[in-house]
Amino acid sequence: MAHVTREQLDRLLDQALLLDDHDALACRLDALARGYESGEMSRAAILVLAAEEWRQAGRPATALDRFRDALEDGGEVPVDPRAGIADTLFELGRADEARKVIAEVGARGWNPATALTIAETLAAYGDLDGALEWATDGVLACPAGITIRDALLRTRYRIRVDLGLPEDDLDALLC
């Protein structure tokens, strides 16, 4: 069993970036999650990192399993694992399932980081109206001065430009 530190995870991530070996990193993160006893981040957060690496390695089905494991674990994560589940379902060509997961997130509560992820996912898969709604709701849920709010404002602005909409009061906050 292992106590996992942020420094340990940072080293793993740095090595993977240098080697461009997402498979190896995903396997190491899986092993850390299996042996997890305690740490500076939750087991669920490690599972989400593993899921993201499996996606980068071209193995979306394995990524989907890890996102689901993170959701089942229930530990603290910056972004709701259901956002990753939805994105991966879109990637797998299962858009109807992805939309159901997104609707569930909307109905059960979310944080601004989750709203950003869902907005970006919907925009990537062509649902600009849905993406705009998530980005707008995310902005409105954030207090001023929060970094994620700026990211939501930028995403929202890009979506509005893609939709051909004129600048509005929220767009003006981008200064």
Where are these regions (language model features)?
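Alpha-solenoid helical repeat scaffolds
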Residues: 30-34, 68, 103, 136
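TPR/TPR-like (Sel1-like) alpha-helical repeat modules
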Residues: 107-110, 123-146, 174
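TPR-repeat structural position
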Residues: 22-25, 60, 95, 128
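Flexible helix-coil transition and linker loops at the boundaries of alpha-helical arrays
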Residues: 31-40, 70-76, 144-145
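Residue at a conserved register position within TPR or TPR-like alpha-solenoid repeats
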Residues: 16-19, 54, 89, 122, ...
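N-terminal alpha-helical interaction modules that lie
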Residues: 1-57, 172-175
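Alpha-helical adaptor scaffolds
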Residues: 41-117
